[in-house]
Amino acid sequence: MAARYWDKLRDLSQKYKEYVIQNPTGATQLESGVRMLSYLIAGRFADSHELSELVYSSSNLLALLNDGILRKELLTPPPTEGSRRRLLTWLGVLESLEVFIEIGAARAWGERSRWAAILIIQLLKACLRIVLLFWYRVGIQSSPPVTPLDREGILNQAEDNSKSSSSCFVGRRSSRAVRSLNDSASSHRRFWRSPQIHEGKQQKNGETENDKEGSELGTLGTLAEAIHILRPITHLLSLAACGQKSWKPWMMAAALDITSISLLSDVRNLSRRERIELRRRMFLLLYYLLRSPFYNNYTETRLLLLLRLLGDYVPGLGLVARPLMDYLPVWQKIYFYNWG
């Protein structure tokens, strides 16, 4: 009985893989539909927030699954080795589920279980990132861990490769690629070199080796990235020691983030992906204005006043400002929205 259900599940899995490979656009629309459903559910009934977050997490997992299928089938060779890719994937799964696990644990077992779940998730994420940093030398680690696939670029690449392979043939003995007469340009527009079947493959995909591989950070750069990885653990431990109303956890976390960014800014020859991630971390320093206790003491009254003025006096902005005012208290209570 179990073997029969397993075979059916495997057949369904294979059919879904074939669907994603043949219809990448349809897979993208499916992900967008699930994500839109999460927005429609929010606020509709008593447990809508938990269900909405579950649906939203499912959309992220679906996108991760579909990207993995397309990478495996359409990219040759795969961008990274198998074990490293698996670690990045598990890290992506944790980041996709962390908010739902937090609010689910709080709903089912109370506040202590919520903080236990937060600590376990942060420990798992830190362990995975430390292994990636010191064992696989991935350099500055981005968020999300697995870069979303440029599906349009992959499809264009596959079409171009198909056209290129059909417009020339390769000699059996010489292994030289020769254009067919029908696809040869006129003499004044022709390049007199052999056609390159795989030319520009990485550039068309929008990724180069320099973008995909981590840079050599050196001792200070590695230390800075380790500080960034361990900052959530340090913050949680200081919260447990000093309490949630104390300024010490907030100041310690801010100091660690600023130190990490300052040291990484001195590292040269960063890849494009790493430079984007570093700019993202600089921007996220603004989040400290929305993190307690700074938010409770300074930002909250000013921000709510600004939103109220925008909603009352700027036509059309009330549709955005008023729901945002209602959602801010909920957002403040969820750790991974603020500190994740």
Swiss-Prot record:
Keyword Transmembrane: yes
Annotated GO CC locations: peroxisomal membrane
Transmembrane segments: 90-110, 115-136
Membrane topology: Multi-pass membrane protein
Secretion signal, residue range per the UniProt entry: none
Compartments, as annotated in UniProt: Peroxisome membrane
UniProt protein name: Peroxisomal membrane protein PEX16
Organism for this UniProt entry: Xenopus laevis
Gene this protein is translated from: pex16
